């Protein structure tokens, strides 16, 4: 179903900041968890605050899905606490993947003059060669501070497949945009299929 190359294939070790946007049930969190699982299987260290991924039942499913030992999962998958997200860059290591859910709660457009928003931009600009990859998840990218939005290389907008029939829940749509502007025609459009096993790795 993913006939066209994913834009993230251009990632060459520079810091990459991308957005996953969509209403509840659109597939955005599912896609983020899938990305986490794919990177766990590659041996990457990941920091996230996605709900449920650190519950014992979900941890067992993650170990089974990725074929990881208890020790490997503990080393690779690390939880970011709520009080760490506003300065998450102080709690991570180079070349890791960071996946932040509900990012508008910490970097809101209503707090446009908050120093932490400027600090995020400063960190991103001064650590470009450290190989971080950061995924910012939100229901509406407009709710995120403009300075933070401007850091996005790509924004992926997820939508439900709104057709009647039993196959509806098997698929979702992904629209790929360059930067934070989602007006106009997307650069890439994909219809993607859900894998039921991934839902058991977090609280959907």
Residue ranges of model-derived segments:
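Glycine-rich P-loop/Walker A and Walker A-like loops and their local beta1-loop-alpha1 context
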Residues: 16-37
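Short, Lys/Arg-enriched N-terminal segments with co-localized hydrophobic residues
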Residues: 1-15
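Short beta-strand-centered segment that lines the nucleotide-binding/catalytic pocket of NTP-utilizing
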Residues: 44-52
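Hydrophobic/aromatic beta-strand patches that form the interior of the parallel beta-sheet core
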Residues: 18, 47, 99, 135, ...
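Conserved nucleotide-sensing/catalytic segment adjacent to the nucleotide-binding pocket
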Residues: 55-122
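Loop/turn-to-beta-strand initiation segments
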Residues: 44, 94-97, 130-136
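Conserved P-loop NTPase motor module
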Residues: 169-204
């Amino acid at each position: 179903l993913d006939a066209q190359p994913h834009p993230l294939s251009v990632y060459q070790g520079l810091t990459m900041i991308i957005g996953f946007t969509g209403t509840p049930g659109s597939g955005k969190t599912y896609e983020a968890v899938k990305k986490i699982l794919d990177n766990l299987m590659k041996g990457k260290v990941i920091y996230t605050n996605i709900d449920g991924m650190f519950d014992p039942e979900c941890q067992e499913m993650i170990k089974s899905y990725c074929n990881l030992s208890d020790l490997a999962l503990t080393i690779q998958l690390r939880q970011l606490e709520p009080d760490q997200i506003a300065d998450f860059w102080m709690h991570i290591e180079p070349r890791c993947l960071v996946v932040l859910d509900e990012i508008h709660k910490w970097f809101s457009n209503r707090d446009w003059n908050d120093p932490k928003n400027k600090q995020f931009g400063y960190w991103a600009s001064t650590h470009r060669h450290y190989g971080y990859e950061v995924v910012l998840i939100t229901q509406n990218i407009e709710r995120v501070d403009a300075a933070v939005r401007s850091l996005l290389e790509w924004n992926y907008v997820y939508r439900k497949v709104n057709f009647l029939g039993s196959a509806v829940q098997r698929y979702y749509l992904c629209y790929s945009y360059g930067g934070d502007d989602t007006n106009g025609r997307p650069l890439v459009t994909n219809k993607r299929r859900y894998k039921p096993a991934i839902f058991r790795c977090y609280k959907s």
